[in-house]
Amino acid sequence: MNLITIERHILEQQKFFPEFTGELTDLLNDVAFAAKLVRREVVRAGLVDILGFTGDTNIQGEQVKKLDLFANDKIINAIGQHGRFAIMGSEENDGIIIPPKNETGSYALLFDPLDGSSNIDVNVSVGTIFSIYKLKGDDPGKASLNDCLQHGYEQVAAGYVIYGSSVVMVYTTGHGVHGFTYDPTIGEFLLSHENIVTPKSGKYYSINEGSYGQFNEGTKKYLDYIKEEDPATGRPYSTRYIGSLVADFHRNLLTGGIFVYPPTITHPNGKLRLMYEANPLAFICEQAGGRATNGKERILDLQPSELHQRTPLYIGSEADVMIAEEFEQGKR
């Protein structure tokens, strides 16, 4: 492993953004610091009283886990105190968040504090996903919901942190995708995956097939297709589904394959959150040479209309996603 810290690497990336005068370095360093705080508690979750539910329900209609709430508070407090973000949005909060010292901020932060948290009680990998936008206006005091509801292609940075057998942080600023592994002996994220490029096609698919009866005909035909025996096209594919989006996405990013969360009868507009999950992962995926759509349109081109907007998601290796789109659009 290279002894290049994430701070040094981000500083080197700053040359691509001279107009930010060092701000981008500070923004991503803030996120990395918050991730260290969350990581500290995730690895101790079974030893302290932060497993289980709080008894509350979030805006998504889901029961709030204690660790969800802890991670959410840590990120807001750790990042908000530095005055670089004028406004935030979290999957766990109903509305926008105005952090302390927001009057000096020039950016908006959107994040899922603990993706896959339903798995934490059984020690399955979970993660934090984040997305950063520049404010539309010049006055931080006037930051509003509109600053959060920007197209995905307007992101200036995005990334995620996986808390698993090791802790890995992956980020992009629009100039490639880079991964860092946390070394607990020195308390630093060190460069471990430079310039990640996802394979053009893979051999894995990730989907909750327990919902097969809820899928539309296009999705069902696609699943039948990738299970057929055809060595010439690398079929059949193998299923790899953890149930933690960030973990499934990370594996497919490195090995090739596709993650699918299609529309269902119960959730015709999809279930994943556009602003907290789909947009940041789509930005990363495209920067690594992959593709991300809702089955019909590019994820990064979607115009958000609400903070907690949902979307179907087809994301991963370019060739695999294109085939899935053809089935979804009735072209196969």
Curated annotation (Swiss-Prot):
NCBIfam families from the UniProt entry: PRK09293.1-1 (NF006778)
Catalytic activity, reaction form: beta-D-fructose 1,6-bisphosphate + H2O = beta-D-fructose 6-phosphate + phosphate
Superkingdom assignment: Bacteria
Subcellular location: Cytoplasm
Pathway: Carbohydrate biosynthesis; Calvin cycle
EC numbers for this chain: 3.1.3.11
SUPFAM superfamilies: Carbohydrate phosphatase
Homology family: Belongs to the FBPase class 1 family.
Protein name (database record): Fructose-1,6-bisphosphatase class 1
GO molecular function: fructose 1,6-bisphosphate 1-phosphatase activity; magnesium ion binding
Signal peptide: none
Subunit annotation: Homotetramer.
GO biological process: fructose 1,6-bisphosphate metabolic process; fructose 6-phosphate metabolic process; fructose metabolic process; gluconeogenesis; reductive pentose-phosphate cycle; sucrose biosynthetic process
Keywords for this protein: Calvin cycle, Carbohydrate metabolism, Cytoplasm, Hydrolase, Magnesium, Metal-binding
Cofactor(s) needed by this chain: Mg(2+)
Record note on cofactor: Binds 2 magnesium ions per subunit.
Main location (coarse class): cytoplasm
Natural source organism: Chlorobium phaeobacteroides (strain DSM 266 / SMG 266 / 2430)
Binding site for substrate: 115-118, 208, 241, 271
Residues annotated for Mg(2+) 1 binding in this entry: 91, 112, 114
Sites where the protein binds Mg(2+) 2: 112, 115, 277
One Gene Ontology CC term in the entry: cytosol
InterPro entries named among the record's database cross-references: FBPase_C_dom, FBPase_class-1, FBPase_N, FBPtase
Gene: fbp
